[in-house]
């Protein structure tokens, strides 16, 4: 009887410790959920983070409720076993004591599962906070006429001038590759380019005049050859008729 009473006290203590652990885990999860909700409310994307945390909270709550119900069922069964053991002989108490050794192991397993679930819950919280951080807002423009406004205007002007000079330099380098020159000075390159373009223009005009004259001469030659061809054609027809008449006269 003393042993069974001790076991009963030990089980009651373990049951109380388990309830305390479950309660602490619930409190920790509720506190973490509140902190996460407050942090996420400052962001424009808090709805998704809150939904994710609520889903994890519901799952953890259901698991804890299932664990508590299983614990209550286990404690009820333990009470029934105690009442039955009081009416059994010492031999049966000895046999049942060997079977009760596995109960603390189950409780340790449940506590380990609760600890793992709490760690997983914290991991989901950290993941939600990482994924839904607010983006930094752009700084406001300086007021018109202020020193900062003038400074930015000067910098913008310098940037425009730099791009313009870079574009001009790129064009001059491309021009130096196209014209036959070995000069490296920009002014000389431009002067050479102007002279080269003028020569090309003069050559083009000369070629146009040359091609126009050649075209006229070719058309004149074609006309003369056509007239000569017609003349030869008529002479050939006259000769053919004379030959036909001579053949008929011989017959």
Swiss-Prot record:
Which CDD domains does the annotation name? bHLHzip_scCBP1
Compartment annotation: Nucleus
Composition bias (Low complexity) maps to 40-56, 117-126
Q: Which domain of life is it from?
A: Eukaryota
Stretches of the chain forming a coiled coil according to its record: 190-223
Specify the bHLH domain's residue ranges: 152-200
Per the record, what is one GO cellular component? Answer: nucleus
Induction text = Repressed during biofilm formation.
Q: Which GO terms describe its molecular function?
A: DNA-binding transcription factor activity; protein dimerization activity; sequence-specific DNA binding
Q: Where do Polar residues bias regions lie?
A: 67-76, 107-116, 127-140
Q: What happens when the gene is disrupted?
A: Leads to auxotrophy for sulfur amino acids.
Its keywords, alphabetically, are: Coiled coil, DNA-binding, Nucleus, Transcription, Transcription regulation
Q: Which GO terms describe its biological process?
A: chromosome segregation; methionine biosynthetic process; rRNA transcription; single-species biofilm formation; sulfate assimilation
Provide the residue span(s) of the region labelled Disordered: 1-169
**InterPro entries per the record?**
bHLH_dom, bHLHzip_scCBP1-like, HLH_DNA-bd_sf
Bias type Basic and acidic residues, positions: 7-28, 77-105, 144-167
State what this protein does. Answer: Transcription factor that binds ribosomal protein gene promoters and rDNA locus with TBF1. Necessary for the expression of genes involved in assimilation of inorganic sulfate. Also required for the expression of respiratory genes and glycolytic genes. Does not bind to centromeres and is not necessary for efficient chromosome segregationas as does S.cerevisiae CBF1.
Q: What is this protein called?
A: Transcriptional regulator CBF1
């Amino acid at each position: 009887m003393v042993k069974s009473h001790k076991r009963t006290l030990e089980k009651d203590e373990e049951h109380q410790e388990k309830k305390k652990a479950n309660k602490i885990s619930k409190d920790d999860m509720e506190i973490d959920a509140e902190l996460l909700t407050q942090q996420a409310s400052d962001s424009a994307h808090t709805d998704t983070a809150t939904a994710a945390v609520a889903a994890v909270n519901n799952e953890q709550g259901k698991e804890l409720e299932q664990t508590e119900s299983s614990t209550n069922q286990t404690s009820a069964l333990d009470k029934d076993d105690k009442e039955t053991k009081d009416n059994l002989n010492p031999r049966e108490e000895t046999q049942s004591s060997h079977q009760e050794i596995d109960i603390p192991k189950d409780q340790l397993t449940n506590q380990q599962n609760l600890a793992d679930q709490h760690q997983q819950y914290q991991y989901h919280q950290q993941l939600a906070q990482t994924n839904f951080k607010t983006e930094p807002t752009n700084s406001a423009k300086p007021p018109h006429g202020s020193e900062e406004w003038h400074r930015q205007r000067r910098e913008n002007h310098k940037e425009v001038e730099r791009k313009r000079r870079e574009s001009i330099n790129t064009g001059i380098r491309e021009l130096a590759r196209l014209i036959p020159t070995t000069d490296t000075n920009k002014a000389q390159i431009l002067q050479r380019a102007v002279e080269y373009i003028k020569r090309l223009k003069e050559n083009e005009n000369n070629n146009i005049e040359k091609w126009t004259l050649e075209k006229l001469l070719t058309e004149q030659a074609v006309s003369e050859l056509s007239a000569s061809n017609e003349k030869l054609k008529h002479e050939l027809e006259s000769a053919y008729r004379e030959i036909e008449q001579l053949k008929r006269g011989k017959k």
